[in-house]
């Protein structure tokens, strides 16, 4: 959109075409997505159709962000619709840049792709720091082709490789599907874990029957191998890919 323009180029082209064709009665709306490199999940796309069902939908809107300045953003549809192919397993891994989480998940994609008949898809998120920053790995695998060009928001398995994310209140367990698995790599006892988990996370775990596991890969890695290798084994085992 050019500064001072009434709309985006495509919106203006369509509006001009409709007007010249005498079709002014057609309701025309225009929206933006991908602003700030933000992901566009299915819940945002469903929000567009929900908006179009109104008698007077917004002429201009944005999706994928929360616009509290111009208030043009559409609220995402909740709960998020499930659009993945039936039988697809979705996993999400929260790591620390440089801890090997991304490398381990790339290895997992190779193992699953080379040694099973399953389809596999992987996306990786980094922040600007890269090393020492937050990384999120998104893995999908299943028996049917995977056509999900967006990040995972409702996972069967979520792993937190850095316990500081729990103490900082990162919303990780909220990405687990009801009945799914949430795993934390930490050195805490049960009492310490109960102290570090905030009330919102505890309520979500209880209300959605989340299976909570802890693994002390930190101490084990000192004795045996890297943290990422141990957690990679755990994630593959919990997904029933290891026999």
Show where each model-derived region lies.
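Active-site cofactor/cluster-binding pocket
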Residues: 1-8, 12, 16, 21, ...
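Peripheral docking tails and interdomain loops at the edges
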Residues: 2-83, 214-224, 229-243
